[in-house]
């Protein structure tokens, strides 16, 4: 678009607001062949600070991360104390005389699949403040694993992938209010690897130290750290649904303090812009005055 320019003492002067990350390329043409065009941000829309709790929407199920378990090798009677899963992998390898995994080990597909020599049995304790039906377990090697939940055998038929082509979803039975027990038995050997598993569903999660608890999904959330509001492990998109009142037929949305790739802004379901760089602004003009719903997707 034509720049806002003027001529003074034989010089061309360009007036331009410049923000962090901005860059401009100007094409200088013959004098008076293009009329100057002033482009300004309208600040006549009024201003209000949005606070408090608002409705929200998740783009996918919430997540309970299970990365610590008790374990035993097939043939052992007692489970060993709870430990972080990658350390457990090396503990199991040491018990079976297998070389430990490390940052420089050869990838398992280089030498092909090696037959398992035993089984690793992992036990997870899952605490819940609610009864919940419809949970999904996401794990690697789902079809090779034997899974029980609260002593009931779990059908390990794969529903679909989760996040990665090597992580699979299987349906879990009802999660009971109180303490639940998940046991996963994997064939184990030189080619095997133990990894974290995930429980997915429409529930909240609280974390206190190493203790995680399933809770009811929050009805509303506030602006700020979502990890303390029921979503410590959630990695999908989150949309804040904010009631706003439009005056002067315009709306400027400024959101400069966020952690994410960008914020998608929509008004009553219609996109009005993406907020990623200074001045962290999305604008809507020529809109009807009155009550609307602003949606900010992070």
PLM region spans:
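Ordered hydrophobic segments in well-structured contexts
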Residues: 1, 23-29, 121-123, 136-138, ...
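Solvent-exposed beta-strand/loop surfaces of large extracellular or lumenal domains
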Residues: 1-14, 142-143, 147-168, 264-282
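Non-catalytic C-terminal accessory modules of carbohydrate-active enzymes
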Residues: 2, 18-19, 225-226, 233, ...
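Short, exposed beta-strand/loop patches in secreted or surface proteins that constitute
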Residues: 3-7, 34, 47, 55-56
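C-terminal beta-strand-rich structural cap/linker in extracellular carbohydrate-active enzymes
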Residues: 10-38
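An acidic-aromatic loop/edge-strand motif
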Residues: 43-119, 141, 160-165, 170-243, ...
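Extracellular and analogous surface-interaction loops
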Residues: 118-135, 172-175, 240-251, 284-287
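Aromatic-lined ligand-binding clefts that engage carbohydrates, nucleic acids, or primary amines
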Residues: 126-150, 182, 244-269, 294-296
């Amino acid at each position: 678009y034509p720049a806002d320019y003027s001529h003074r003492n034989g010089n061309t002067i360009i007036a331009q607001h410049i923000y962090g990350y901005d860059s401009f390329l100007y094409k200088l043409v013959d004098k008076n062949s293009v009329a100057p065009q002033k482009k300004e941000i309208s600040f006549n829309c009024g201003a209000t600070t949005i606070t408090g709790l608002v409705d929200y929407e998740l783009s996918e199920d919430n997540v309970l991360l299970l990365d610590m378990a008790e374990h035993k090798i097939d043939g052992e009677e007692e489970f060993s104390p709870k430990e972080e899963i990658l350390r457990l992998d090396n503990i199991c390898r040491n018990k079976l005389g297998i070389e430990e995994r490390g940052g420089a080990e050869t990838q398992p597909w280089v030498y092909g699949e090696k037959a398992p020599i035993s089984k690793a049995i992992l036990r997870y304790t899952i605490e819940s403040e609610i009864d919940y039906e419809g949970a999904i377990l996401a794990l690697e090697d789902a079809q090779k694993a034997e899974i029980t939940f609260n002593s009931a055998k779990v059908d390990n038929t794969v529903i679909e992938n989760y996040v990665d082509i090597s992580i699979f979803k299987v349906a879990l039975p009802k999660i009971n209010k109180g303490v639940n027990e998940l046991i996963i038995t994997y064939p184990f050997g030189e080619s095997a690897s133990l990894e974290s598993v995930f429980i997915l569903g429409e529930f909240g999660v609280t974390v206190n130290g190493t203790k995680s608890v399933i809770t009811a999904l929050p009805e509303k959330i506030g602006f700020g750290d979502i990890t303390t509001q029921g979503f410590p492990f959630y990695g999908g998109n989150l949309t804040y649904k904010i009631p706003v009142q439009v005056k002067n037929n315009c709306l400027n949305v400024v959101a400069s303090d966020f952690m994410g790739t960008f914020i998608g802004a929509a008004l009553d379901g219609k996109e009005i812009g993406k907020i990623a760089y200074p001045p962290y602004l999305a604008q809507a003009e020529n809109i009807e005055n009155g009550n609307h719903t602003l949606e900010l997707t992070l």
